[in-house]
Amino acid sequence: SFPTRRSSDLKGEKEFSGNGVSYCAVCDAAFYKDKITVVTGGGDTALGDALLLSRFCKKVYLVHRRDSFRAGRALQNRVFATENIEALTNATVSEINGDTKVTSVTLLQNGEEKQLDCNGVFVAVGSVPDTKPLANLVKTDKDGYIIADESGKTSADGIFAGGDIRTKALRQVVTAVSDGANCVISAEKYLDEKQ
């Protein structure tokens, strides 16, 4: 089981998913080399995605519906110091436009509507773990992620959790694989001790 990125339900989001709309900057940033992208969101994920994209893209617009970001101060400082990132606050993307690929977004900012040319939109409004089947067995945090230590040990005896469903800072394939290896070793050790 793994978390799924939250969608924004933007007009055009589903139509252009995989053709200019992405939910993973780590996966897709290189496809936008020397292009213009829009990142939607205001938390750590959005600002981290904007920073990553800034290393590839000519321009990155960071669009957030509030007047200030929720991300950590150090991350915000890095974003604001990056020349090719432009933060657009009190703004929302109301529509993603294009033919076969994304060509622009319709932006609503401070009551005014305008078109913003871009080649890609990165939706970075968080993720939702699929842990409901385990909700009565193990402790989860407020967002539904299973609370587990580095060995994968959870609050329930003999249940180990790894990958993107457990509490941790980075959710990528490489960290999930590492978690899996740790869980296997921990489960083996657990079973050996039970014999």
Residue ranges and their predicted role:
Residues 1-7:
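Short, small-residue-biased leader/transition segments that mark boundaries at the very start
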Residues 9, 14-31, 124-175, 179-182, ...:
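FAD-site-proximal beta/loop scaffold in flavoenzymes
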Residues 20, 35-36, 59:
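Residues that mark the start of a beta-strand
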Residues 41-43:
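Glycine-rich Rossmann-fold phosphate-binding loop(s) that bind the pyrophosphate
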Residues 46-47:
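N-terminal Rossmann-fold NAD(P) dinucleotide-binding loop
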Residues 50-51:
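Generic hydrophobic/aromatic pocket-lining and core-packing "Φ" positions
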Residues 55-150, 189-195:
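A Rossmann-like FAD-binding core segment of flavoenzymes
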